[in-house]
């Protein structure tokens, strides 16, 4: 499972011009699910991201998690993160989970983030989404489990 996290001052996702999720300061999480992933992977990645220290403390060092910063979370499914881009001019998605598996694990991941006490907003699974964000920093990390 892959989480591309971006520290944002705000972010929103729309589908067909309908706002489906928006947050203020917090994390935008683009989530890629691979066929080898399971519920334990989702729980582990959620725990790791919720506690990953990417927010500044009073000394301007990255010592605070999104929990510490009392931030919000916007989770957007993105199967393209599971692409193999090592060869050729077209990505291979052979390691991506099936849509049913990915949707289930996406939901489990979101539930696990909420269980950490975080306000969680989401995109719409498998929809053609427009994501707008203001990356704070910019700060972007890729986490894998």
Swiss-Prot record:
Catalytic activity of the protein: glycyl-tRNA(Ala) + H2O = tRNA(Ala) + glycine + H(+); a D-aminoacyl-tRNA + H2O = a tRNA + a D-alpha-amino acid + H(+)
Chain span(s) of sequence motif Gly-cisPro motif, important for rejection of L-amino acids: 137-138
Family annotation (InterPro entries): Daa-tRNA_deacyls_DTD, DTD-like_sf
Classification via CDD domains: Dtyr_deacylase (cd00563)
GO molecular function, one term: Ser(Gly)-tRNA(Ala) hydrolase activity
Entry keyword set: Cytoplasm, Hydrolase, RNA-binding, tRNA-binding
Gene Ontology CC annotations of this record: cytoplasm
Compartments, record wording: Cytoplasm
Top class in the EC scheme: hydrolase
Pfam family for this entry, one: Tyr_Deacylase
EC number annotated for this UniProt entry: 3.1.1.96
Source domain of life: Bacteria
Keyword hit for Magnesium: no
Entry's transmembrane regions: none
KW Methyltransferase (keyword) present: no
One example of a Gene Ontology biological process annotation: D-amino acid catabolic process
Subunit structure: Homodimer.
Chain's role: An aminoacyl-tRNA editing enzyme that deacylates mischarged D-aminoacyl-tRNAs. Also deacylates mischarged glycyl-tRNA(Ala), protecting cells against glycine mischarging by AlaRS. Acts via tRNA-based rather than protein-based catalysis; rejects L-amino acids rather than detecting D-amino acids in the active site. By recycling D-aminoacyl-tRNA to D-amino acids and free tRNA molecules, this enzyme counteracts the toxicity associated with the formation of D-aminoacyl-tRNA entities in vivo and helps enforce protein L-homochirality.
Family: Belongs to the DTD family.
Domain-related comment: A Gly-cisPro motif from one monomer fits into the active site of the other monomer to allow specific chiral rejection of L-amino acids.
Protein's name in the database: D-aminoacyl-tRNA deacylase
